[in-house]
């Protein structure tokens, strides 16, 4: 352990030693590890297969790690793990079809609070999720909220997508900002000056899973807006805070933002930032490694910062990824063993390390992992989880809040205001849509 730039740096060896002590080591594990240590023959018939559906990752190297691990597990157990990777926005549709048809992928890795919508087709995986959480320091509230529905674990938390603001340091300095703005009013001022110089801010408002929702939910919360009360039933979106955010955003759109953002998806702002078309964008750390490998000028000039504070504080909507085991799976025991196996710390760490701060593990054990301080420009991504909320806050995560997100109600509310609908009318529309869901 060393002290560097005022920060305690923990070596990987020190971290793993502490982690092993905390979890009791691998010797405490049963299941597949126990079988392999004992040299027992696999208990599954020849030709046994598991179908695993997941999104194409924005950090492709993580997919290779997982694919290699799936192949390793299959080889050891004499089974085949068939991994299918598709676009992230296509996963919910495929998952819904699997639940409806009672057939399809055995395991589905899915984002956000969608497990609540699909809970009827999911196996209770508490016997997998609970031991993992206990062994690894407990789950973050956000991770559990999006995977726990109706009093049971309908999915095993896998990761939380880190999200903050990517920006060009030199361009901000040119307009008088030597550090990223602390408040939304400062953000507006910065953006106005940047756009005047041909370097607008870029925000996505299309129907895409991550960035549009992250921005719109986060901005709403920063100004004190919420969808529902703590009871999870009473719709309270039509309040002063929401309206303030809804009035601010169209002004920022005209003054500060790239006006192509209405049709952007989660990859559009990445491309625009790397091309130098925009100066600032909210995103995961997926732009940074691409810049490092292919756009050295962008890489040297970019940095990351937390989201600005509003009157109510600083808050984030962070996408989560969870693993659902479907009821139609004929090999549920094997599927659970596979999930336990690749979520064990010695294998999960390899995936997490490869993700390079893109993903926050769902459990608290990893907070002091050295990956977070490997590059000072990425440290901000570790702490965004502290200010994260789930859709439907202050109520509990639920099927209703999942439906609201799936229908992009908040995103469309902001998009309507951008396109000229008076903010008051856009807010009334969104409130009415929420009331239909929560009725």
List each model region and its residues.
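Long, aromatic- and glycine/proline-rich binding clefts that accommodate carbohydrate-like moieties
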Residues: 44, 49, 137-145, 302-305, ...
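N-terminal secretory signal peptides
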Residues: 1-14
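Extracytoplasmic "Venus flytrap"/periplasmic binding protein-like
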Residues: 68, 72-139, 148, 170-182, ...
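Conserved C-terminal helix/tail region of periplasmic/extracytoplasmic solute-binding proteins
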Residues: 44, 80-81, 120, 173, ...
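Short, solvent-exposed loop/beta-turn-alpha elements that line the ligand-binding surface or hinge
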Residues: 43-45, 126-139, 207, 225-244, ...
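Hinge/lid segment of periplasmic solute-binding proteins
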Residues: 44, 111-164, 188, 215, ...
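Glycine-centered hinge/linker elements that transmit conformational signals in sensory
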Residues: 190-193, 232-262, 307
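Extracytoplasmic/periplasmic solute-binding protein
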Residues: 32, 149-158, 163, 188-235, ...
């Amino acid at each position: 352990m060393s002290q560097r730039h005022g920060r305690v740096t923990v070596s990987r060896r020190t971290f793993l030693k502490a982690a092993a002590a905390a979890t009791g080591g691998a010797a405490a594990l049963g299941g597949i590890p126990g079988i392999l240590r004992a040299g027992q023959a696999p208990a599954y018939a020849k030709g046994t297969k598991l179908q695993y559906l997941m999104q194409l990752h924005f950090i492709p190297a993580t997919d290779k790690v997982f694919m290699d691990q799936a192949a390793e597990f299959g080889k050891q157990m004499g089974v085949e793990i068939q991994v299918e990777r598709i676009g992230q926005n296509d996963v919910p549709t495929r998952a819904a079809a699997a639940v409806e048809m009672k057939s399809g992928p055995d395991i589905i890795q899915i984002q956000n609070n969608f497990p609540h919508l699909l809970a009827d087709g999911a196996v209770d995986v508490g016997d997998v999720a609970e031991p993992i959480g206990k062994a690894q320091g407990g789950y973050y509230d956000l991770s559990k909220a999006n995977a726990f529905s109706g009093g049971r674990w309908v999915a095993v938390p896998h990761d939380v997508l880190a999200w903050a603001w990517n920006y060009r340091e030199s361009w901000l300095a040119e307009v008088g900002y030597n550090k990223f703005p602390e408040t939304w009013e400062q953000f507006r001022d910065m953006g106005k000056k940047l756009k005047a110089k041909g370097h607008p801010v870029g925000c996505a408002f299309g129907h895409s899973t991550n960035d549009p929702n992250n921005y719109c939910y986060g901005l709403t919360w920063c100004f004190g807006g919420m969808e529902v009360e703590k009871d999870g039933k009473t719709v309270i979106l039509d309040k002063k805070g929401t309206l303030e955010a809804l009035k601010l955003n169209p002004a920022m759109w005209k003054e500060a933002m790239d006006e192509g953002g209405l049709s952007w998806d989660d990859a559009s702002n990445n491309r625009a930032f790397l091309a130098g078309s925009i100066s600032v964008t909210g995103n995961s750390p997926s732009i940074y490694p691409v810049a490092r490998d292919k756009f050295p000028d962008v890489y040297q000039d970019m940095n990351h910062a937390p989201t600005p504070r509003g009157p109510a504080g600083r808050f984030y909507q962070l996408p989560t990824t969870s693993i659902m085991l479907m009821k139609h799976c004929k090999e549920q025991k094997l599927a659970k063993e596979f999930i336990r196996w690749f979520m064990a710390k010695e294998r999960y760490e390899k995936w997490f390390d490869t993700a390079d701060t893109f993903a926050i593990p769902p459990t608290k054990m990893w907070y002091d992992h050295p990956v977070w301080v490997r590059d000072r420009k990425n440290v901000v991504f570790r702490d965004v989880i502290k200010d994260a909320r789930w859709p439907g806050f202050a109520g509990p995560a639920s099927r209703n809040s999942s439906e609201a997100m799936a229908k992009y109600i908040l995103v469309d509310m902001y998009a309507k205001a951008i396109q000229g609908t008076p903010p008051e009318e856009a807010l009334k529309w969104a409130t009415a849509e929420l009331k239909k869901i929560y009725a």
